[in-house]
Amino acid sequence: MNSEEQYYAATQLYKDPCAFQRGPVPEFSANPPACLYMGRQPPPPPPPQFTSSLGSLEQGSPPDISPYEVPPLASDDPAGAHLHHHLPAQLGLAHPPPGPFPNGTEPGGLEEPNRVQLPFPWMKSTKAHAWKGQWAGGAYTAEPEENKRTRTAYTRAQLLELEKEFLFNKYISRPRRVELAVMLNLTERHIKIWFQNRRMKWKKEEDKKRSSGTPSGGGGGEEPEQDCAVTSGEELLAVPPLPPPGGAVPPGVPAAVREGLLPSGLSVSPQPSSIAPLRPQEPR
């Protein structure tokens, strides 16, 4: 088979869409597309009807080119010379690039001088997890400058000033808070939190006082009994006017009061009761 027949056989192969089991392929040109040489995965097996035609093409194809690729052309064809000139460079791109470790060094041989600094503050470790920084497999270390929020210890002088301020104002204003912070050598946040906690404590104490002041029975206190017994057959206790100091005792006062047996404020009236029994009404 001469070069002309081989060229027409290759052209017929690219024109037939069933050879690659794809859609219609455009006309074959002298410069084949570069994607034919960039594929890394092996192509699917050829259909049985083209096995005989491809067998003749495999004899003249180089070992590095797949049977589906363009067969070699004659040396006098300029397209074939151009194809063989660019073939080694295109096949060299299919190899993977060298690894990131130069000079054949292993990944375990490299040691990180400093561990990766975490960009976000919430990703840093706290003092509660500081033991993880000593673990050999830990991905982070506990930073010494990282301070965990601790409980503020107020002095007696500071507590005295704060209690005095709370006695007058349950809610402190911003200017007064700044003034107290400068005077007591505290921050505004410390004073704000102290007043919040103190208000909660004060509310709990007030609720406890209200609950303890109300009796369990739910009723109010009993009223004192009045010393007044009004019966139909008894005499009423009358309170006569007090005698003038150093004066004579009025004639209506009984002898028991004169002798001091009864208190001078209370006495039995000698006159009979003015309350008369009710008479039943006669039917009309």
Swiss-Prot record:
Pfam families per the UniProt record, alphabetical: Homeodomain
Positions of the UniProt region annotated as Disordered: 30-116, 202-284
GO terms for cellular component: cytosol; nuclear speck; nucleoplasm; nucleus
MF-aspect GO terms: chromatin binding; DNA-binding transcription activator activity, RNA polymerase II-specific; DNA-binding transcription factor activity; promoter-specific chromatin binding; protein-containing complex binding; RNA polymerase II cis-regulatory region sequence-specific DNA binding; sequence-specific DNA binding
Record-listed Phosphothreonine modification sites: 152
Modified residues (Phosphoserine): 269
Annotated GO biological process: animal organ regeneration; cell population proliferation; digestive tract development; endocrine pancreas development; enteroendocrine cell differentiation; epithelial cell proliferation; exocrine pancreas development; glucose homeostasis
Domain of life: Eukaryota
Keywords, ordered alphabetically: Activator, Cytoplasm, Developmental protein, Diabetes mellitus, DNA-binding, Homeobox, Nucleus, Phosphoprotein, Transcription, Transcription regulation
Annotated consequence of substituting residue 269 to A: Reduced phosphorylation by HIPK2
Biased composition (Polar residues): 50-59
InterPro entries, A to Z: HD, HD_metazoa, Homeobox_antennapedia, Homeobox_CS, Homeodomain-like_sf
Tissue expression as described in the entry: Duodenum and pancreas (Langerhans islet beta cells and small subsets of endocrine non-beta-cells, at low levels in acinar cells).
Major place of residence: nucleus
Induction: Expression is repressed by FOXO1 in pancreatic beta-cells.
Region Transactivation domain, residue ranges: 13-73
Family: Belongs to the Antp homeobox family. IPF1/XlHbox-8 subfamily.
Domain remark in the UniProt entry: The Antp-type hexapeptide mediates heterodimerization with PBX on a regulatory element of the somatostatin promoter. The homeodomain, which contains the nuclear localization signal, not only mediates DNA-binding, but also acts as a protein-protein interaction domain for TCF3(E47), NEUROD1 and HMG-I(Y).
Function: Activates insulin and somatostatin gene transcription. Key regulator of islet peptide hormone expression but also responsible for the development of the pancreas, most probably by determining maturation and differentiation of common pancreatic precursor cells in the developing gut. As part of a PDX1:PBX1b:MEIS2b complex in pancreatic acinar cells is involved in the transcriptional activation of the ELA1 enhancer; the complex binds to the enhancer B element and cooperates with the transcription factor 1 complex (PTF1) bound to the enhancer A element. Binds the DNA sequence 5'-CC[CT]TAATGGG-3'.
Protein name per its UniProtKB record: Pancreas/duodenum homeobox protein 1
